[in-house]
């Protein structure tokens, strides 16, 4: 948002008011006309409240074109203007509990509600409470029950004709239900996009290499205001009705809650998260309950709305210039706010991911004080053009990690510095690498890096790797936090006395883990490679590497070209392997693991050709429980004999090995006439004898 003048101080009310009007009008134009909002809601609200207060303190400063005297933005070009039969007003906002109590008191006083000697209202006001959706307000006009026109709010008096686009919203009925419909009905409501639909839309945008939307509100607004309704038809928009403009040919319902019930009977979509309450206490209780479930709702809301329920009381209360006196929007703490970005550091995740983190001047947003926010990755920093020293928009929603949405370029200082991604890990000093076609840069010091220690140990110990039974996440947490284990090699130095002292670790558990560690020393090359936790190297690739090279040293010393010769190893996997073994820290840990008395496995020469036995090239399916072999052991034996172990039975299956409680796979094999073997038959086949 470009500035045309320096920001005047509060001591100059005339200049300050003019500046505030200019800032707000520019923000309105960007939001309503350009569809490019560039000022957070919280900042807009703050500037608006300041202008309101200035005009209250200095009535002579009020101008006819002040944003406080109007509802929204002007109609944009490209759509036919529509003059609303009844103005589409916005609502005054409340933020603190005190604002709600004051609102209730104003309403009660205006309605001359009775009070007791202590001044407490004995006849509390009845309110209808609803959600405040984060979308785009529209009006729907029905004549004799048939939908004829839709218009945006615009400036409250004149909006834009979006009839053809609204026709594509499937939740909006083109004809009202029931035999008795009004001659004219002007329905007020909100067009929005559900969270799941927003996620799917952005997936489609990415797949088509088109611009993604920042949030569901922007997506809904942009979709509704498409000049081509065919595009709108492809966008998953929804609608909720919540108000009324004009009603002819029928009496108006006596209460707002009755109006919404009537809408439902007409087939209009009405949100069910609503209630009728009494007094300020009821309002605040509704607000708290909605706040607790806010993040689990399938759509975005930014507050709740309170309306005096009785229609006759609404009429008595009337309106001010831009809003009804009988209603108030109670907004949640702002999810976006402005602050200064003072530095950008990098954080190393459990898997080695390097994430830029913004260090911020403290700002209260989303109900908490935020000093740090994620910048996701280097590409995001570049795309958003975020620099050190910028004034930035920070967003925090619920329990979601705060993020920097963007920078206000018009406020950028001359000395703002660009972010430079480090080349070495700030934790362990290992090289930082970024694979082709990946957004995330990573530390290559996997086994050595303290930031990755817990993840590396957990992966090393899992069943398909070294299979260290009893070494769970809670034990790993203690071992790392007490600095007893730095790398996987340190696991094999643990003694009974050390383990027995761990929290909630009995002597029997300690001995079981010692026994499990001793057993884990005898493994296979494939399991060991998989246990190293090399990025993109799964169980199958580890087996292919072990088969191809026969021993570990040739794998560690292999060039990318040599790695590419391995079955199913492509450029990304080869690059990942090469980077891992090129890091000296990783080689050191591997040598420690291979030291005398540590991990061993049978090594052999590289396989010059595929196995030539009766199982070579055959497809085998395992099902049920075998008497003496685990499924993993049977799978390893079959693969060593050149067979492929599949997960489902088909016409291409050569054998099915069935144990106890074999299920549908056995039935399918019998149906297709595929040979079925038990464990003895499997052993015969492995020995080269046809069972």
Swiss-Prot record:
NCBIfam families linked to this entry: dnlj (TIGR00575), PRK07956.1 (NF005932)
Domain BRCT: 610-691
Binding-site residues for Zn(2+), renumbered to this chain: 425, 428, 443, 449
Parts forming coiled coils: none
EC main group: ligase
Keyword Oxidoreductase: no
Protein name according to UniProt: DNA ligase
Recorded catalytic activity of this chain's protein: NAD(+) + (deoxyribonucleotide)n-3'-hydroxyl + 5'-phospho-(deoxyribonucleotide)m = (deoxyribonucleotide)n+m + AMP + beta-nicotinamide D-nucleotide
Catalytic center residues: 132 (n6-amp-lysine intermediate)
Lineage: Bacteria, Pseudomonadati, Pseudomonadota, Betaproteobacteria, Burkholderiales
């Amino acid at each position: 948002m470009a500035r045309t003048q320096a920001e005047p101080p509060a001591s100059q009310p005339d200049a300050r008011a003019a500046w505030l009007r200019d800032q707000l009008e520019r923000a309105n134009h960007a939001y309503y006309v350009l569809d490019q909002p560039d000022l957070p809601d919280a900042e807009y609200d703050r500037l608006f409240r300041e202008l309101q207060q200035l005009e209250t303190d200095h009535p002579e400063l009020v101008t006819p074109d002040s944003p406080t005297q109007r509802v929204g933005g002007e109609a944009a070009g490209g759509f036919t203007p529509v003059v609303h039969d009844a103005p589409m007003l916005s609502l005054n906002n409340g933020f603190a509990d005190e604002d709600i109590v004051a609102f209730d008191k104003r309403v009660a006083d205006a309605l001359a509600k009775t009070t007791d000697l202590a001044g407490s209202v004995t006849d509390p006001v009845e309110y209808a409470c609803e959600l405040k959706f984060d979308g785009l307000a529209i009006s729907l006009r029905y004549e004799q029950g048939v939908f004829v026109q839709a218009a945006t709010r615009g400036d409250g008096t004149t909006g834009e004709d979006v009839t053809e686009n609204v026709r594509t919203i499937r939740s909006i009925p083109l004809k009202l239900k029931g035999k008795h419909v009004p001659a004219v009905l002007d329905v007020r409501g909100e067009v929005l996009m559900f969270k799941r639909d927003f996620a799917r839309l952005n997936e489609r945008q990415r797949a088509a290499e088109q611009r993604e939307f920042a949030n569901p509100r922007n997506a809904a607004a942009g979709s509704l205001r498409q000049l081509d309704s065919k595009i709108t038809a492809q966008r998953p928009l929804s609608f909720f009705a919540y108000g009324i403009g004009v009603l002819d040919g029928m009496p108006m319902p006596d209460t707002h809650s009755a109006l919404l019930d009537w809408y439902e009977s007409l087939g209009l979509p009405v949100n069910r998260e609503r209630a009728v309450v009494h007094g300020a206490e009821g309002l605040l209780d509704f607000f708290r309950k909605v706040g607790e479930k806010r993040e689990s709702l399938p759509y975005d809301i930014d507050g709740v709305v309170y309306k005096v329920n009785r229609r006759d009381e609404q009429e008595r209360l009337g309106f001010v210039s831009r809003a009804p006196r009988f209603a108030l929007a109670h907004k949640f703490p702002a999810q976006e706010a402005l602050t200064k970005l003072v530095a950008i550091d990098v954080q190393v995740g459990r898997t080695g991911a390097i994430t830029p983190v913004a260090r911020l001047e403290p700002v209260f947003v989303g109900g908490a004080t935020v000093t740090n926010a994620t910048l996701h990755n280097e590409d995001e920093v570049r795309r958003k053009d975020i620099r050190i020293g910028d004034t930035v928009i920070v967003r925090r929603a619920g329990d979601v990690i705060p993020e920097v949405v963007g920078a206000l370029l018009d406020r950028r200082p001359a000395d703002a510095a660009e972010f430079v991604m480090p080349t070495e890990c700030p934790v362990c000093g290992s090289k930082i690498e970024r694979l082709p076609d990946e957004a995330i840069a990573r530390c290559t010091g996997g086994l050595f890096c303290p930031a990755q220690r817990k993840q590396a140990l957990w992966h090393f110990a899992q069943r398909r790797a070294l299979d260290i039974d009893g070494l769970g996440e809670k034990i790993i947490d203690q071992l790392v936090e007490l600095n007893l284990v730095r790398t996987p090699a340190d696991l094999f130095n643990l003694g009974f006395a050390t383990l027995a002292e761990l929290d909630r670790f009995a002597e029997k558990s300690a001995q079981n883990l010692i026994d499990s560690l001793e057993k884990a020393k005898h493994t296979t090359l494939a399991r060991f490679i998989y246990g190293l936790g090399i990025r993109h190297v799964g169980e199958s690739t580890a087996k292919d590497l072990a088969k191809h090279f026969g021993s570990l040293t040739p794998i560690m010393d292999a060039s990318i070209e040599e790695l590419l010769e391995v079955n199913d190893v492509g450029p990304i996997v080869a690059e990942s392997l090469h980077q891992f073994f090129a890091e000296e820290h990783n080689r050191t840990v591997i040598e420690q693991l291979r030291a005398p008395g540590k991990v061993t496995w049978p090594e052999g020469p590289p396989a010059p050709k595929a196995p030539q036995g009766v199982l070579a090239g055959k497809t085998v399916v395992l099902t049920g429980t075998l008497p003496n072999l685990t499924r993993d052991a049977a799978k390893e034996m079959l693969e060593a004999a050149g067979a492929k172990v599949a997960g489902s039975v088909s016409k291409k299956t050569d054998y099915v090995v069935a144990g106890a409680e074999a299920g549908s796979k056995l039935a399918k094999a019998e149906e297709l006439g595929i040979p079925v073997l038990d464990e003895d038959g499997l052993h015969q086949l492995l020995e080269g004898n046809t069972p």
